[in-house]
């Protein structure tokens, strides 16, 4: 499933150019740069997941099943149980620290499931890069929180939850195919939220005109 990944590779190249060898993913740099790096990583992860979701759907899910599955219990996302904003107005009402806390909770919920994706997808971009970029982004969010909270190191997590692992053998199990389909859908939704929250922060702090993210 290698189609549709050009934009993901482009974002990966940008990140590589911005992270010289031997340096931490998020060194001691200005707030604007920290936030810009976090947005780029969130964009990259969201794009790779969206491409993978589309390719998986085309490969494993019959067309007559796709829309019905999107409304089924299999598509329920754990992230819907936390008080994270789901629309633009609510997002703008939250503080920057709140948006970072929501983002951190969403990212951490995928750390374990993503590691099992190496067995499901031979795509090297997905298998090797997403977990590392999640870890980089987690580190970046902690750096942003320390920057915004006068260097305090707190337990910023909202809830401790994680998604189930992906089924590594969807070819032989229809339930497994649907489970993976649902998990990828949730992953895509959650990363879209994280990207949106970070873009709102960036817009509020560093864009002079009205923020319309």
UniProtKB/Swiss-Prot annotation:
Annotated keywords: Disulfide bond, Hormone, Secreted, Signal
Superkingdom: Eukaryota
Compartments, as annotated in UniProt: Secreted
Gene Ontology CC entries for this record: extracellular space
Chief site of localization: secreted
Signal sequence region: 1-25
Residue stretches spanning the membrane: none
One term of GO molecular function: growth hormone receptor binding
Entry-linked InterPro entries: 4_helix_cytokine-like_core, Somatotropin, Somatotropin/Prolactin, Somatotropin_CS
S-S bridge residues: 77-186, 203-211
Pfam family, any one: Hormone_1
Entry function: Growth hormone plays an important role in growth control.
Protein name (database record): Somatotropin
